[in-house]
Amino acid sequence: MPGKIGKVVQVIGPVVDIKFDSDSLPNLYNAISIDMGERTLIAEVEQHVGDDIVRTIAMEATEGLKRGMDAVDTEKAISVPVGDQVLGRLFNVLGKPIDNAGEVEAEEIYPIHRPAPSFKDQAVEPEMFETGIKVIDLLAPYQRGGKIGLFGGAGVGKTVLIQELINNIAKEHGGLSVFTGVGERSREGNDLYHEMRESGVIDKTALVFGQMNEPPGARMRVALTGLTMAEYFRDKGQDVLLFIDNIFRFTQAGSEVSALLGRIPSAVGYQPTLATEMGALQERITSTKNGSITSVQAVYVPADDLTDPAPATTFSHLDATTVLSRSIVELGIYPAVDPLESSSRILDPRLVGEEHYNVATKVKNILERYKELQDIIAILGVDELSDEDKAVVSRARKVQRFLSQPFTVGEQFTGMPGKYVSVKETIKGFKEILEGKYDDLPESAFLFIGSVEEAVQKAKSLA
């Protein structure tokens, strides 16, 4: 039974105004279907304008759309397939497969606009989530069911870090992942899909893409599509990983849509509803008594300015932040995680244990001291330092290099096999470096290795 039928009266880019009878206006967020002959265009109701016109945002390109075309109210929000059938598949914002592998026979279809779990259904049992990446596990550990932000400017390695996390989680934990590409490069999405197929982790992952060549409506809603698929698995008792690359593009698309809808912009040209939109998305990413969603969100930082409203609004929702720094890229250390800027709420002796907390604190202290001494070294040289400070500099440089690690997903570029290092091994390695056990080894022996024992082997080969 078709829903209410209206007529297209105005098209301005992705904004489509549709006239309905005043007593049968579609609800906000309803999906409107417009038959264009060769294809069907889906648009979402964003505003009611006057008595009989709804203003919608198209989820696909509007080329070929004309005034006078029929538009049918589907009487429900955009709905996407969920369940085991979505694993190993590639979707767009509407939940349509885009991998040329046939239709998805899903048991259930969920609307992308859903309420966040109620307060009484949420579970907060802080527990550490091992990633196998030394710098993260030691200094800014992730919480199971927490929200993690990867902050960094252009080209510092956010996407590579996300790919390594997907790889480690699938292989070491056997967990399910939902990867949502929001307004990023299609080439990277294509690479990710093919790499996942080759490495065999695709069967545990659903991929949803709304890339940077798509209209702002698709980029604004695709994060909700991925989240909806993840929520289904969580409610069925699974521990799910939700990757969003890039959450800034979600804000950026919201800003474009807001301007197109004629709202007055707020600070730095962003939409006045920035905090509300971000809150509506982030509040749904939570753990319940059934299962958990651990989310890792890449956050592009415009002009490396962390006070920009988009990254600043995201900050307030996160449990851990992993900050990638250009100054560390310049040192040739990857992953380029800034050990002093990155932080985690669960780096607490009651949650990670006394030993982990003490080693992490000492590592931060020695790096902080090294940073202070760098000014003196730049002016007077290392020889003018006291013996104690020379030892600090030597160990700090070893610690700095030991924070690097070869990645499995980077193996084809570096030629080095990737390493997964357990938390226990990580703590042991840093503890021994700080105690001076490896003072006689050259600092280059600590670059791009897994456990600390490999430094001894590498030193022999360098000698």
UniProtKB/Swiss-Prot annotation:
For this protein, the record's SMART domains field holds: AAA
A single GO cellular-component term from the record reads: proton-transporting ATP synthase complex
Residues noted as binding ATP in the record, renumbered to the chain: 152-159
Cited Pfam families? ATP-synt_ab (PF00006), ATP-synt_ab_N (PF02874), ATP-synt_VA_C (PF22919)
Q: What is its EC number?
A: 7.1.2.2
Q: Which UniProt keywords apply?
A: ATP synthesis, ATP-binding, Cell membrane, CF(1), Hydrogen ion transport, Ion transport, Membrane, Nucleotide-binding, Translocase, Transport
Fetch the Gene3D superfamilies from UniProt.
2.40.10.170, Bovine Mitochondrial F1-atpase, Atp Synthase Beta Chain, Chain D, domain 3 (1.10.1140.10), P-loop containing nucleotide triphosphate hydrolases (3.40.50.300)
Q: Which residue ranges run through the membrane? A: none
Domain of life, per UniProt, equals Bacteria
Q: Does the keyword ATP-binding apply?
A: yes
The cellular location(s) given in this protein's UniProt record come to: Cell membrane
Catalysed transformations (reactions): ATP + H2O + 4 H(+)(in) = ADP + phosphate + 5 H(+)(out)
Q: Subunit info? A: F-type ATPases have 2 components, CF(1) - the catalytic core - and CF(0) - the membrane proton channel. CF(1) has five subunits: alpha(3), beta(3), gamma(1), delta(1), epsilon(1). CF(0) has three main subunits: a(1), b(2) and c(9-12). The alpha and beta chains form an alternating ring which encloses part of the gamma chain. CF(1) is attached to CF(0) by a central stalk formed by the gamma and epsilon chains, while a peripheral stalk is formed by the delta and b chains.
Concerning NCBIfam families, the annotation shows:
atpD
Instruction: Describe its function.
Output: Produces ATP from ADP in the presence of a proton gradient across the membrane. The catalytic sites are hosted primarily by the beta subunits.
Q: Which family does it belong to?
A: Belongs to the ATPase alpha/beta chains family.
Please give the name of this protein.
ATP synthase subunit beta
